[in-house]
Amino acid sequence: MLHKEAVTPGTLELLIEGIRFASLEDIAAMKLNAVIGNGTRLKDFVDIAYLSSYLSFDQMIDAYQKKYQTRNPLIIIKALSFFEEINFKEPLHIIIGIYKWKSVEKRINQMIKSPPKTFPPFS
């Protein structure tokens, strides 16, 4: 279920063939919130790493703060840095490319070290 407030006004009203679409900012905010709330889902970490090709970590944090105003943004860094509880046995379906955890982990660490930067797509 989508949070009723969109980071970018009007984006949750975008319908294509009856499917409601959220902006990348809204998706990033929801993914960060998911990692903070339950840091066990591998998919959330992978999605955040893949989003870094389109949004900087600063933009993701800004989107998170706009969508979830009561949350402390410093928790994001802590949650993204804690990999010990991720369920690596969870089935993961990647549409484009091949998933490699070491690449995802490296990207997340790069995002934290260089928040204003966007990164090239995974190869």
Describe the residue ranges of each PLM region.
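Compositionally biased terminal segments of proteins
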Residues: 1-123
